[in-house]
Amino acid sequence: MKAVEAEVEVKAEAEKKAKAEAEAKAKAEAEKKAKAEAEAKAKAEAEKKAAEEESVYRRRFNRHFDELRWLYMELYGNDSMFAELCDNMERFYHERSRSLKTSDYMREARPDWYKQNDMMGMMFYIDNFAGNMKGVQSRLDYIEQCDVNYIHLMPFLDTPAGRSDGGYAVADFRKVQEKLGTMEDLEDLTTACHEKKINVCMDFVMNHTSEDHEWAKRARSGDGEYMSRYFFFNNWDIPSRYEETVPQVFPTTAPGNFTWLPDAGHYVMTSFYPYQWDLNYRNPRVFNEMMYNFLFLANKGIDIIRIDAVPYIWKELGTSCRNLPQVHTIVRMMRMIGEIVCPGILLLGEVVMEPEKVVPYFGTVEKPECHMLYNVTTMATTWHTVATRDVSLLKKQLDIVNGLPKDYVFLNYLRCHDDIGWGLDYPTLAMEGMEERSHKKYLNDYFQGYAGNSTSRGELYNADPVTGDARFCGTTASMCGVEKAGFEQDDNAMDVAIRKDLMLHAYMFMQSGIPVLYSGDEIAQVNDYTYKDDPNKAADSRYIHRGAMNWDLAAKRTDKTTVEGKMFRGLHQLEEIRKSEKAFVSYADTWTIETWEKGVLCIGRYYDGDKIIGVFNFSEFDKTAWINETDGDYVDLISGRKMKAAGVNIPAFGYYYLKKC
């Protein structure tokens, strides 16, 4: 009898569960249908507006004209060049495709479109990821499976072989590297991406060109018009004065800021490498032509323009030639030009500077500059936290970011194509007894695997034997211990490494802003040491984390017993939670909570009645987060377990997303 009753009870429970699932599915489908209908209506309205092109352009132009002219004349004082700029802006507007204009109108109507909780980025080198642009197009389904709707195509414009600086020495701003494809392939790719609602980002190198650029070739031959587009000097007098105040970017691999050209009989300014010549933005012709290049690329379907090395673009004798006021004038003008011609475009600033020098590149709420900036300092501080198991500096850094206006959007990432520079808040660390030089050495030793308790692997970049300074290179997985565990065939260590990797991603998703994955991180891809076999790469250890995408490993992502499957499934779960919970929008209230445990970080998010608390253990030991949220019960969105948000016990490298019930 009892067995029958139990069977009836189980059956009733199953029917109840099935009914709840059916109702949830029906609700989700209804919401999806309503969203599709709203999007269709918005698109129809946008297409209608597209028919009013001329009046739309005039409205945008008139809105910005006074400020744009004021700033241009303040910088250049040249009416004819300003008139030429305005004429070409209108030309590029009329050349812009109907589909891109429709997208512009839709984004104008919803200016916070990129701040939603479904915005997820991925960056990759085209050749490493899929061979060429057609290959990337064939992999869009994979990108969708990664829950990514924004891809950053690392530099793909034409560069000279062997002197490309990873694509940042551009020889032609209107030509794609032959091995990667053509401009037509780029347009095909952006069109295919837009059909899948994937946004495309590219690098726009404003500070310099390759010495193989047509301008540079003419300048080298002695053409004064083109020499004036760079910084040429026929003796060492003025360059020597610059060297007194301008820091070196690469003091060991490319010392100094000038290069002697024997065939030209002149010095030329080269802040980065000798084959990258700094552009002279004092010349209005340089600004105008670079804006035309910007608009040309925007019209190819690019959604996000990453302005490379933006703090460097204005030079002034007697200064550091970094972060000068004129830089902000140029970025502000670029923002307005974009809002007039192609308002669907976003400007992403690459500002690798101290925190107080980064934020000004957002501009002000009234006069904005960049839409988004990289959260460089928080990234470096995150890895400091991994090495020290002490969240105090990271908590302070997050508090600063969380205190900024909600209009300011950071891109958050764990790793990227570049090295990690240890630009930390050393005055604060000094109060904890940490000295800058010795702490940098500790961090580099730790992540190379030299410290006794380290599981990380990687290499140094640009090490200076005199100062002891160096930067670090490695993939997220290798820095978390996946490489070491795999080499030693230690299954337990591998589980710990994957949990650590996932914890860091869960924490990154909880930050204010937009998360960006580095391609390969979704399958825990480790360091690639084969770069040492290539003479063009062997001297640059950054290529250790620029390895080709391993599609054989990626194919294992569907097997939950593999390293790739565990990582991919874990990330997918986090991404699905982020997309489904409105508290993850970029403009949500975000704050940190004191845990009274130096190895545990706690972040709160609140939006429109929803509250989520993230708890992250940066230690290899079980800990307790001594928080005390007394406003009710919580449920962990990851495990589904109901919990109290008070005295939370959390396992080694564990993570919780606690949502208030």
Per-segment meaning from a language model:
Residues 6-46:
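Long, low-complexity, compositionally biased polyampholytic IDRs enriched for Lys/Glu and Gln/Arg
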